[in-house]
Structures are given as structure tokens and as C-alpha cells.
């Protein structure tokens, strides 16, 4: 799914309002606070800030910001693992066949292997911000 329009459509269907997945060039240093502050305060957003599609098996990183109760629907990726680095707020992850719940806070890293269902929901009053790392050309199979 390397088509930015397809990625934007999926993110939009999960309630994200401001979407920018057209990374023009990787930056040597990305100031996350600058990226966060470039979007309207209080609104959800997704911004691709890493794309190493020419050189790495896990090659895409997007900063995702959502409000309480927002998240991504239960799905899995048949050809790629996915990682998240928690930046702000609390997130509830449901991962695996048994929907095991994990509460992730800033500084935590969450991992879901390929073919494992996972769902993410922001549970804090403040916005939840996470950095999602995975394969750019990955399929998402929804439950």
C-alpha cells in the first residue's frame, strides 16, 4: 500500500482529520514538537516523518495524534510487523487472538508481529501521540 492516497483514505476512515503522508525527503533531525505544533491544537493528525523504502525492511514512520476514544480499528498486516513509540497520552492496545490489553504511556514501545490482530484506542483526556513504524507497502486486513 505505497500509494499515499490509499494510506490517507484508511487513516481518514479511522477518524484522523489532518493527514500528510507525502514525505518529500527524510530529515537528519526531526523536532517532534515542531511537527506537533504545525497542526491545529486539539485536532487529530497523522504525518509521515520517516521513509527509508529504498534501504530497509521496516521503512516507514508516521506520527499519529488522536483524541480520547479515537484510534484504529482491529486489523492485522500479513507481511509486516508494526511498532509504536509512545510520545504523549495513554493508549490501550489490544493485541493477539485473545485481545490481550496493554496500557502504553509515554516512553513505552509496543510491538505487534505480522498476522496478529491489533487495535489501538486513546484513553487519556489529553491527546495521544504515537510514532508508528512499519513497512510502507503493507496490507491491512480488518476484522
What does each model-found stretch correspond to?
Residues 80-106:
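A short beta-strand-loop-beta hairpin characteristic of the jelly-roll/cupin
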Residues 63, 76, 87, 95-97, ...:
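Residue-level recognition of conserved beta-strand positions in structured domain cores
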Residues 1-58, 73, 143:
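A short, N-terminal "cap"/entry segment at the start of jelly-roll beta-barrel domains
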Residues 105-106, 114-141:
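Ligand-binding loop in jelly-roll beta-barrel domains
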Residues 62-78:
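Conserved short histidine dyad/triad with adjacent acidic residue
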